[in-house]
Amino acid sequence: MNKDCIFAAPIEKLGDFTFDENVAEVFPDMIQRSVPGYSNIITAIGMFAERFVTANSLVYDLGCSRGAATLSARRHITQPNVKIIGVDNSLPMVERCRQHINAYQSDIPVEILCDDIRNIKIENASMVILNFTLQFVPQQDRQLLLEKIYQGLNPNGGLVLSEKFRFENKKMDDLLIDLHHQFKRANGYSELEVSQKRTALENVMRTDSIETHKERLKSAGFSQIELWFQCFNFGSMVAIK
């Protein structure tokens, strides 16, 4: 696994964070050291797939990056005639994802598309995964995307939505942000790396509160919604049609 050193040296003109070649190369290391509970979420996505995925249906991994969630789901699918569709708008991610998927043998076909997830038609879905993806979608487009997902899910189909959260209570928000930064420092990131990455993400990652996510999901049509995992200001929700 290649080590993430992207923000280790001072960057004079710090642009917006992008999922480019450099990020794609070190992404597994970056996300493990940056997102508390990431491995638990990936493992649980497979467990959810065991429960949600039905025969003759599709599974969508929207914002699939290098395929960790796709592979976790595929390992746990036992139903016949299931196909997984992974989508990411970063070509370097898609190329590595295809290599990663092809390195493992399985009877379950996987198609990885390089596209904007907002362009994808969701249909005959028994499960949809949004694993730390919605926070990078423009806020004005999030409701419509969730509505498309709800419409494309079969009855009893499930959506797993993992996100970084913000909290309305400023004192609590500041505390959880500080604890997250402490988590990153404990994983070997310097103060410079933490601050430069935070600045680079400011304009591209817009976080919402848990309440906002629940309201959006309700408005999309979901009635069964639960936060099933949280560690500091990161967590994952499940919604069932």
From Swiss-Prot:
Keywords: S-adenosyl-L-methionine, Transferase
Top-level taxon: Bacteria
Keyword Transferase included in the entry's annotation: yes
UniProt xrefs under InterPro entries: CmoA (IPR005271), Methyltransf_25 (IPR041698), SAM-dependent_MTases_sf (IPR029063)
Entry protein name: Carboxy-S-adenosyl-L-methionine synthase
Enzyme class: transferase
Main function: Catalyzes the conversion of S-adenosyl-L-methionine (SAM) to carboxy-S-adenosyl-L-methionine (Cx-SAM).
Subunit-level organization: Homodimer.
Catalytic activity: prephenate + S-adenosyl-L-methionine = carboxy-S-adenosyl-L-methionine + 3-phenylpyruvate + H2O
List of residues binding S-adenosyl-L-methionine: Y38, G63, C64, S65, D88, N89, D116, I117, N131, R198
Homology family: Belongs to the class I-like SAM-binding methyltransferase superfamily. Cx-SAM synthase family.
Pfam entry (one): Methyltransf_25
GO biological process: tRNA wobble uridine modification
Molecular function terms from GO: carboxyl- or carbamoyltransferase activity; S-adenosyl-L-methionine binding
EC number: 2.1.3.-
